[in-house]
Amino acid sequence: MAKDIQFSEEARRSMLKGVDTLANAVKVTLGPKGRNVVLEKKFGSPLITNDGVTIAKEIELEDAFENMGAKLVAEVASKTNDIAGDGTTTATVLAQAMIREGLKNVTSGANPMGIRKGIEKATAAAVKELKAISKPIEGRESIAQVAAISSADEEVGQIIAEAMERVGNDGVITIEESKGFSTELEVVEGMQFDRGYASPYMVSDSDKMEAVLDNPYVLITDKKITNIQEVLPVLEQVVQQSRPVLIIAEDVEGEALATLVLNKLRGTFNAVAVKAPGFGDRRKAMLEDIAILTGGQVITEDLGLDLKSATIESLGRAAKVVVTKENTTIVEGAGDPEQISGRVNQLKAQVEETTSEFDKEKLQERLAKLAGGVAVLKVGAATETEMKERKLRIEDALNSTRAAVEEGIVAGGGTALVNVIKAVKAVDATGDEATGVNIVLRALEEPVRQIAHNAGLEGSIIVEKLKAEEVGVGYNAATGEYVNMVETGILDPVKVTRSALQNAASVSAMFLTTEAVIADKPEENAGGADMGGMGGMGGGMPGMM
């Protein structure tokens, strides 16, 4: 296919249009007086949201060069979301500011490589200062404040704080849709381990890329399954029950995996395969934990058991299993409460006895998974549109709170970024590197300016006043007052602010050093040719192979 190529100034200008289009759509959502964005959906009602990454992912531009610029900034939002789970709008605002300022200087003749070094130096200094002015998060009230700021809802803040109190800061918290109008917390017994599905074709929800099994059987073995004949007898018994099955094995590959995927796609049989968690002896112990939790049995040659002779009685059961690319969560296993309690006490005793810090940490992880349970936040709303929007906000709030527990908190509302300006000004740089530092200095003001703009105020006046105030004093756009942000409960997790800044700086530096952009040339008669009629699909749907 022929290509279109643009060079230097022309290329960067085209991409900048895309950057501005995406960033302008995202940044209207920033701050307590930020607005919403409505996204068209092919099916069902439109989605109304103020979640930066959700908006960024939806934007596709007709011009290929502009679209590449938009996708670069969407990558900033997506990466920040992956690392910190929140802060995507801030990251987008920072990236746009750095790119616009940088482009002015490159157009004036500055060396992009020198600017890049300056941006990297300034970002490193800003991150170091952010960590220096941060405070550890302490107590339920602080956790509730972080969650409330992220979701713009005090009730959500309290619910998330309670959930973390019930299952621990590292506990498993999932978010589901409720049939009622209110948002409630429910703690159910469950276990999560860090292994995902063996094939993406096993997913049942393509939007979230997760496989959800309701009321499944659980087959647990320490063997590698390569031939479907090994598990066919027990799978046929499961098929007769018309229930799905989760297969936990050392590995599922080759013909066995292909057959499971094929039958899943045909709708004949719903099975999801995952690798067993852990390694060596720890793997055997974790499989035993899962077996006790689900009321099943580990099919292992150590006990003289063979897959071919396994029956449905040796399988575990659960109310629900959710499998993502990286994790598997088993909810409400059907195990005997006495056996589960006995296993928990056994693990507690092992924690007391072991002298190895590593072993102690791993035992405590297993104990938390077995005894901690899973907190389920059931999101309710009057309409489906409101529910989706509320669910996205709660997901952001939960991620933000976890990030705060992990690395601490700083003043929110863009205040912390203004507070680090003094440290960035002290960076030793000359020439084009100094220009790069100045680009970051200007960008650090942008979140406060945008929050003020969304509240109908002049941002530059507020920024200058904040520079003269002591560290931690910021502008509360909700009330129009200058307050100590931490004491007022307007907080941002360090991890969120840091990730937003680092990702914005990274993409901006790459953008400014771009000298050529290559895109596919659009075909003149694309879609012009008529498609012939599709022949009928022969053959019925055979049963399991």
Swiss-Prot record:
Recorded GO molecular functions are: ATP binding; ATP-dependent protein folding chaperone; isomerase activity; unfolded protein binding
Give the similarity note: Belongs to the chaperonin (HSP60) family.
* Binding-site positions, ATP: 29-32, 86-90, 413, 476-478, 492
Pfam family membership, one: Cpn60_TCP1
Identification of the protein by name: Chaperonin GroEL
Q: Which UniProt keywords apply?
A: ATP-binding, Chaperone, Cytoplasm, Isomerase, Nucleotide-binding
Q: Which CDD domains match?
A: GroEL (cd03344)
Name the job this protein performs: Together with its co-chaperonin GroES, plays an essential role in assisting protein folding. The GroEL-GroES system forms a nano-cage that allows encapsulation of the non-native substrate proteins and provides a physical environment optimized to promote and accelerate protein folding.
Please state the gene responsible for encoding this protein: groEL
EC number(s) on record? Answer: 5.6.1.7
Task: Tell me how this protein assembles.
Answer: Forms a cylinder of 14 subunits composed of two heptameric rings stacked back-to-back. Interacts with the co-chaperonin GroES.
Provide the species name: Shouchella clausii (strain KSM-K16) (Alkalihalobacillus clausii)
As given in the record, the signal peptide range reads none
Q: A Gene Ontology biological process annotation? A: protein refolding
Catalytic activity, per the record?
Answer: ATP + H2O + a folded polypeptide = ADP + phosphate + an unfolded polypeptide
Gene Ontology cellular-component terms for this entry are: cytoplasm
Q: What class of enzyme is it?
A: isomerase
Q: Tell me where in or outside the cell this protein is found.
A: Cytoplasm
